[in-house]
Amino acid sequence: MTPTLGLSQAAVEDENWPQIKQRMIERGLKYESAWEFYKALEVDSEDTTLSPDEVPDWSGLWERPGGAPRWFDSDQVDSKTTANLKGEYASMFNEILVSAEQGQVWDPHSGCGQARGYPGMLKNGRPHEFAVTPHQTWHLGQARNEVRRIYTDGRGHTPEDWAYETEHGDSIGFWDGQTLITHTMYTKGGWTGRLMPYLSTALESVEIWKKTDDQTIQADVWIYDSEALETPWYTRQIFKQIHQEEGSPLRLEYWWNCHSQNNIVVQEEDGGTTFLDLDFTDMDDK
């Protein structure tokens, strides 16, 4: 079944987006694995490392346009994922949809600061921050205190006999001019978001990151998963810079967990609920 597609941010910014997206999908289909794709990109690149004065400026805070995206693929408009699932992963996703129709939606990441992990953190609607250096790029997500390190110093992945799965996996990359190209593996797979599919630990990906203008960073993402996907899953993830008043820079929330003041819900006298008052100000913030 072909999923229904909507008007994504990419489509809003480029009227030729449907044709561009199809070319990107076909690009991923040329390779049997994300690693093969990544190595082909590396061969074609001009530079693989940057000097300090060549590092791009990705400073500031960034957010997903239009608020928190509902789906990993912003072209998707209903609950039919654009991922081409197979086997038990297709069955699990169908069970999720059936449960949702009955009013039961599973969301283990909505409380207690449990990391969404990779690739789910890419779609997170809370602020993002990027710390770019010649040898590493850090992608930080405010929600759930997520930190993803992408090594660009020429190292390979953790050797297989030392490696184990983690929430964000093991990411390496290189620079092609001002474009960051990454490969990720050794993730825990798992759940990608509310009413979205599960993926396996066989997941690996290629991402192509670049700043397209002063206000926009985009990432073209191809996810390969030999156990969960029939074909690579391509999406474009877009991040817009959050406006900041001069002299009053914004920052990520210091800490995110069950006990963060803005996450504690308490019962009111009338039986309703509200968030607990912040204790570092005398102002009434109800």
Give residue ranges: language-model regions.
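Sec-dependent, cleavable N-terminal signal peptides
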Residues: M1-P3
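PEST-like low-complexity, intrinsically disordered acidic/proline/serine-rich tracts
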Residues: L5-K286
